[in-house]
């Protein structure tokens, strides 16, 4: 996992808020985020935003693609954001639209899983639901069995226009089940961002998995794999909820 001790000590509250907005804007648009866009959101001048962006870039949290004047989050930026989501140090206003979208998602998961009397069908429905709700590849492992869904959907994301990235993801998937079996990530929710993926450091994807108990294995996992450009707050919540639902019904 990326170490961010210096960042925690040096970043200001406004810089945290700007980083959050860059991450959320980039997740929606897949386009580098410029200072003019941020200036409108924060009600300050573009020059002020450019100065704050320069500081975030110096801290390694955002970067400037060669072909754009805007900025994109780095793996370290995503890690800082996710860490603060998990420990509650960074709280953001959720729009009514976002709240209702999440509630519809959890309801859809509950209905689809709870209606299944057989474990295999429930797991497949859970994986399919995560694919539909997040646009990522959905996966689950129970013992030595791996469930996958949504590979074609994953590769429609703009990040995977590059065949090199597709090949890196394919290699990661080939080794995913053996790695989960051996490494057995122990947290209820595990997030591996970009270079943190031990079996796919160059794949530029994030793996978000929830560990859950089942009658078949005490090391069962369900989650998603997708580009590092994610709506982490929503996806993490949906993955955690799905794992909890499977624990209840299996």
Regions found by a protein language model. Give the residues of each.
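Short, intrinsically disordered or compositionally biased N-terminal tails of bacterial proteins
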Residues: 1-8
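Intrinsically disordered, acidic Ser/Thr/Pro-rich low-complexity regulatory segments
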Residues: 79, 86-250
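N-terminal helix-turn-helix
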Residues: 21-28, 32-84
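Short, leucine-enriched amphipathic alpha-helices that occur as contiguous helical runs
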Residues: 11, 15-19
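Conserved RecA-like P-loop NTPase ATPase core
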Residues: 18, 74, 224
